[in-house]
Amino acid sequence: LRLKPRARRVIVLGLDGLDPKIAKELMDREELPNFKALSEEGCFKPLRTTIPSLSPVAWSTFSTGSNPGKHAIFDFIVPDRKTYLPVLSSSHIGNTSRSIKIGKYNIPLGKPEIRLLRKSTPFWKILGKNFIFSQVLRVPITFPAEKFYGTCLAAMCAPDLKGTQGSFTYFTSAPDEEARHIGGVEVKLSPKGDHAWEGKIPGPENPLVEGAPEMEIPFTLQNGSGSWKLVLPDQEVPLREGKYSDWIELTFKAGMGIKAGGIGRFRLLRTDPHVELYLTPVNIDPRKPVMPVSEPKYFSSYLSKMQGPYATLGLAEDTWGLNERVLEEGAFLEQTWDIHEEREKMFMRALDTTRRGCVVCVFDVTDRIQHMFMCYRDPSHPANRDKDTEVYKDTITDL
């Protein structure tokens, strides 16, 4: 006997890292009128967070209703018990144990093991067992996406194509003594004539070759009468100084017809006195994912066909690039809002296509902007030394 549902559809909208004190402050100042209306129609209550109060821990508790002792997520990373080196706490990606050698290639026998390490059962799987359909979009700690009655696009801790949590690439033509040595991946541009430079885009390791060297894509950066373009093996990408390119398809060839597809966005940072080029972390291509970023597998491809390419990296907003000062604040905000717009399109489509059931969507913009711009609310903060704090002091409020 099934009881009559109290609601035809439930919508859960998550805003990562949004402090209830800041939200209340803005509501009282009439700067969040929709939030205020919701609080008056329903309720507005602060929730006690987890111990420890970290995003992967708190979101795992949100998903499962379990404490960290049950879902086994206590941090972003944990020590490997064999080596004591840090490893990701939420998922495990392992190589195949057997291979066969054909010429210079080692052909893996089987697929690599990819496991979600979070324990306990998320509420959408419980809903699915009761024949209630759910769309789960970008909820943290959902990689690899699990099978259930619904669709899921993974989020926080989903890797980039290299298997990292987000490695940008900085290309420069500056000589070593003048180059900015940064913490990301730095690649030297070599001159090719008077108005062109050559470089290589580093990609994932090649598991087919002894020693697993990085796969690379060669390119030429050309300047013709002030018009810049990036010439890749199978396409040309127009570039403008201080502007992002569209998402560009990047295909790394391992050999024997095996390829790994990713997407990235370029930004020509400056052209004088030296050429500097930025590439976002190479995201797993949602059109042909090499890892399980969605459930069903075709769901990421479906979304891409509906709205175009989009970021699949869990921590897609490049906070590392901003910390290393490869990106300026304005460039970071532009990237962040572009990713937010992609998420909005997904959410609105989920609302249109799910008339019954549950829709869950998490937006990260609140977390990323607060992390990177909280210091501007305090002019005396040590991170603001020699900075004009007036420009970005209202960035969080303007959210």
Give the ranges of each region predicted by the language model.
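Glycine-rich loop at the start of a catalytic domain that most often binds anionic cofactors/ligands
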Residues: M27-R29, V57-P68
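Conserved structured core elements
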Residues: G17, R29, P56, L117, ...
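Surface-exposed patches in mature extracellular/periplasmic domains of secreted proteins
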Residues: L47-T50, R138-V139
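Short, charged/polar micro-motifs that form catalytic or ligand-binding hotspots
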Residues: R9, L13, E25, P52, ...
